[in-house]
A protein has these predicted regions:
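PP2C/PPM-type serine/threonine phosphatase catalytic domain
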Residues: 1-375
């Protein structure tokens, strides 16, 4: 039987922490062991050099905000004012803490450009979903930091043109290649495990959102009244374009059939009306190789926006937020914290409210991951 709020059937496995991961645990601040957070507030960690570390099955990236020695810096003032990221593990219906299958990525000042930044949320699912999402953090960290075409760029506009060229060819290829590289990982079985990818790339005044799955990014702007702009579209099996593709591949989209003969829960992708596998509640995913032949693909959708003076902030989050909170609910919670320039407080309150909603439903709670970016 499937849980209504899970993207797939999961037999959770706790990954082992290797020696290198254990060695750096002593540098971590004392925080709630069930909440993973990175101090991405620009008021903190200014003197640290950039580094990454692991804790509680998570990858963190802390960035140095010091601009000294940045010869390629084309802006004296950064466009992004403040940002913060936090992830909280879900709970079983018995109240036990689950393995957090979410991961997130924050890379700032890539290639020494003050306004070349990447923010991404990866929501893993399946028996080894946590390993898939962690792999994607490592893969995209390497891609953005070491890609030779990016390194050749001497100005931010060149980076943007590189990404925009031929309908986002470089980014499109990078995301598809991530799935191919995932298949090569001997320690990860991705047949029935995968991850979403909701990625925001900021280059100067331009925003590119690349999305696979149902993690979501929204942009809030304000002229006369507050306006919510979807930077990504959820990839759900019952949505027209997704449904047509899945049927073309021979897949079946149905709600889960329970023992009492009732179809219930979200629409899922199945191999047949017998509902043998994979039972995915999303129609695009990185991984889930057994579902590829059913039309569940890693093909990203892109959205392009220009940052304007009336734009206030961006929220990127896994469906642990969106399951019970609407876009409007989220903006109402964040509003007071935006006025105080408190991205950390905004995320903590957002996760608190989402957790309360999950508890009210009396079900197991999903992992929750949020990135907030203030302009």
């Amino acid at each position: 039987m499937l849980s209504e709020n899970e993207n797939s059937i999961s037999i959770l496995k706790t990954p082992k922490i290797n020696n290198e991961q254990a060695k750096i645990n002593h540098i971590l601040p004392k925080i709630n062991p069930n909440v993973n957070q990175a101090l991405f507030n620009n008021q903190n960690e200014r003197k640290r050099k950039s580094f990454s570390y692991f804790k509680d099955n998570k990858t963190y990236v802390l960035m140095n905000n010091n601009n000294n020695g940045n010869k390629k810096n084309s802006f004296e003032k950064r466009i992004i004012k403040n940002y913060f990221a936090l992830s909280q593990a879900g709970k079983t219906s018995d109240g036990l803490i689950k393995t957090n299958q979410d991961s997130y990525l924050v890379l700032t000042k890539i290639n020494n450009f003050s306004n070349f930044n990447v923010f991404a949320v990866f929501d893993g699912h399946g028996p080894e979903g946590h390993l898939v999402s962690q792999f994607l953090v490592k893969y995209f960290t390497d891609f953005f930091n070491n890609n030779q075409e990016i390194k050749k760029c001497s100005r931010e506009i060149e980076v943007f043109n590189l990404f925009l060229h031929a309908n986002y060819k470089v980014l499109h290829h990078a995301i598809l290649l991530s799935e191919e590289k995932l298949k090569e990982q001997k320690n990860i079985n991705s047949e029935y495990s995968g991850s979403t990818c909701c990625m925001l790339i900021q280059v100067s005044q331009k925003l590119i959102c690349a999305n696979v799955g149902d993690s979501r990014a929204i942009l809030i702007s304000e002229m006369i009244k507050e306006d919510i702009i979807n930077l990504s579209n959820d990839h759900k099996p019952n949505f027209k374009k997704e449904l047509e593709r899945i049927k073309k591949y021979g897949g079946v989209v149905e709600k889960c059939l329970y023992e009492d003969g009732v179809f219930d829960g979200p629409y899922r992708v199945w191999n047949s009306s017998k509902q043998e596998y994979p039972g995915l509640a999303i129609s695009r995913s990185i991984g889930d190789t057994k579902a590829t032949k059913l039309g569940v693909l890693a093909v990203p959708e892109f959205n392009l926006k220009t940052i304007k003076s009336n734009m206030k902030y961006i929220v990127i989050a896994s469906d642990g937020i969106w399951e019970y909170l609407t876009n409007k609910n989220v903006t109402e919670i964040i509003k007071q914290f935006y006025n105080l320039d408190d991205a950390k407080g905004a995320i903590e309150e957002l996760i608190k409210k989402a957790s309360e909603k999950w508890a009210q439903e009396g079900e197991s709670a999903d992992d929750i991951t949020v990135i907030i970016i203030f302009f």
